[in-house]
Amino acid sequence: MEKLSLSFGARRALTTARRLCDFLAALACLWAAAWHTPPGAFFRGLTARIFHSRTSARPLLAYYGGGVYAAGVPDSLPALPTRILSPDEALGYGARCALPQLDGDERARIFNRARQEGFNPATFADPRGASAELGHLLARYRAQMGGSDDLAMLDLFCGELAASYARTVVKPHAELPALARSLPPSLCPKGIGLAGQALGLSTAASLSWPVSEHVRVVSPFGEREHPTLGGVRMHRGVDLAVPQGTPIAATGPGRVRRASEDSVNGRCVIVDHGHGVTSAYLHNEALLVDAGDTVSRGEIISRSGSTGRSTGPHLHYQLEIAGLPVDPLLFRKAR
């Protein structure tokens, strides 16, 4: 009887352990569904709207077209010049940031082809001229392909054969997601990701500043003591000290994704600049654009204020790459 009792107890313990494992696995599935699927993003966004809170949920379209930009931002970035970059130089800056992440053989392939085009790869590591030289190389590839910046960047990171094939399948000025979909899934996945990263960083590097670059930053990017809610919280942008009614300019060309008001962000504008890059302008007193509008760099899109969860007139400026907030000061030209 004692032996049977022990066996029954062991079976009971095993059953309990299995149930616990099943419960934990179910929790893990629910977490993954909430944080890494489109339905989860939808319900998190809906909850944030109902309770007037912020959310890190990605826009639904990001799950279907922006995967090539998911590489985000490297841990360290080369310093930008204290001036607005030319389009080709900005393109070269993005490539310069992504190149070190390739393995030696891939970099050697890129450098050998650059030599064939008459470039000296040693200049790609020169802090003073690397962005300009890589920009010239990408301009050469763009001209050879008769396509877009996206096609030129695909050419750089995945090679001429892959880029030529993609060009024959899709329209000449197709963006990277369409180019990537035209290639076999196993062909150059890392190179496609780094091409997306380079395009995102080049877009961010080409942006200007929403107000004078010498306006004081009163609250930087990063963790801080929240001024209204208390406790240490992540500050996803920078707060700029500007008086009520200051004209706020779009930092680059793009399409207005949002122009509306809520109790947290106040009257806010979000501009999609392409290549996974968006800029946000919060707490305005007036909005001068509507969702769907196309804006140019320097166009006045709002006037600053203190709407939403705010303690006084200022502009909260936020920059995101691949759906993740980055420090806008990394891309400010004035130092």
For the regions a protein language model found, what residue spans apply to each?
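Conserved positions in beta-strands of structured domains
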Residues: 218, 255-257, 285, 302-305
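Hydrophobic membrane-insertion alpha-helices, especially the h-region
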Residues: 18-35
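Zn2+-dependent peptidoglycan hydrolase active-site motif and core
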Residues: 233-235, 250-288, 313-315
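Conserved, short, structured surface segments that act as functional micro-motifs
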Residues: 217, 267-273, 293-335
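Surface-exposed, glycine-biased beta-strand/turn segments
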Residues: 188-265, 297, 326
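N-terminal Lys/Arg-rich, disordered targeting/topogenic segments
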Residues: 1-15
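Catalytic glycan-binding domains that act on GlcNAc-containing polysaccharides
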Residues: 47-204
